[in-house]
Amino acid sequence: MKLTCVVIVAVLLLTACQLIIAEDSRGTQLHRALRKATKLSVSTRTCVMFGSMCDKEEHSICCYECDYKKGICV
């Protein structure tokens, strides 16, 4: 009975610690550009090639960066 109570308290304490840590780290992600590039590399969608024509829609779909003045993917 005592051991069960100790285990329950330990689990509750560890759960609380995990929630506190997760809440504190929200919005502090480092290297966002790297994460974006990683997401694009594992994407199953067809991407436009570098130097291809792009606009805001294509840029948001796949192009890493769109030079809107020239209208090309860089």
From Swiss-Prot:
Record-linked InterPro entries: Conotoxin
Domain of life the protein comes from: Eukaryota
Signal peptide: 1-22
Free-text tissue specificity from the UniProt record: Expressed by the venom duct.
Location of this chain's protein in the cell: Secreted
GO molecular function: ion channel inhibitor activity; toxin activity
Keyword match Signal: yes
Keywords per UniProt: Disulfide bond, Ion channel impairing toxin, Knottin, Neurotoxin, Secreted, Signal, Toxin
Primary localisation category: secreted
Disulfide bonds: C47-C63, C54-C66, C62-C73
GO CC terms in record: extracellular region
UniProt propeptide residues: 23-45
Domain notes: The presence of a 'disulfide through disulfide knot' structurally defines this protein as a knottin.
Family indicated by similarity: Belongs to the conotoxin O1 superfamily.
Name of the protein: Conotoxin Bu4
Taxonomic source organism: Conus bullatus (Bubble cone)
Lineage of the species this protein comes from: Eukaryota, Metazoa, Spiralia, Lophotrochozoa, Mollusca
